[in-house]
Amino acid sequence: MKLLTFCSFKGGAGKTTALMGLCAALASDGRRVALFDADENRPLTRWKENALRSNTWDSFCEVYAAEEMSLLEAAYEDAELQGFDYALADTHGGSSELNNTIIASSNLLLIPTMLTPLDIDEALSTYRYVIELLLSENLAIPTAVLRQRVPVGRLTTSQRAMSDMLASLPVVQSPMHERDAFAAMKERGMLHLTLLNMRTDPSMRLLERNLRIAMEELVTISKLVGEALER
């Protein structure tokens, strides 16, 4: 089982949204995915509840409460016993012993960020913290920045400047663009199943097209993540 962790010191950086998107892409490819909800607000638990009501939860996936060390250990042990292919961990903001344990146990670390001065500053702080932690533990874990809510059209001058600041860091080549499909995942459930349900309704043809484009974007990101895990 490969553990992928989404981490950021800043709340609202897009950790949970990125995790939901990658989960949908992996599940659509037939992968079994365990989700470790290490945020005390349990956003992944609420996501599953919403998805079950909408018939958009994939049975290949399961959410585990993991906001305490004992819960995390139990979640990891059970997920391995159940034979999940991947575990995706949603950390809480800031540094803690729990976050450090998750980071140090990961196979890949993703740091989501939007292209604003505040977000980039927090992403750089998170990246420095992660690298220092890995060095102190004598670990070499691939770490990359995932750009979030990137405009579909041209970037503003400020956004280009923020993107340039990331040039010296490992960055996932394909970003998650700013799309309603991504923003609505928390309420609608898993994107690939939402898309499947809409394909049967002719009145939803335009929305179905938008969801399909978003899903294709997630599949591209999941392939890049898979390549990073194989290096």
Swiss-Prot record:
Keyword Cytoplasm: no
Originating species: Rhizobium rhizogenes (Agrobacterium rhizogenes)
The protein's name: Protein virC1
Domain of life per record: Bacteria
Tagged with keyword Transport: no
Lineage: Bacteria, Pseudomonadati, Pseudomonadota, Alphaproteobacteria, Hyphomicrobiales
UniProt entry keywords in alphabetical sequence: Crown gall tumor, Plasmid
InterPro entries reported in the protein's UniProt record: DNA_Partitioning_ATPase (IPR050678), P-loop_NTPase (IPR027417), VirC1 (IPR009744)
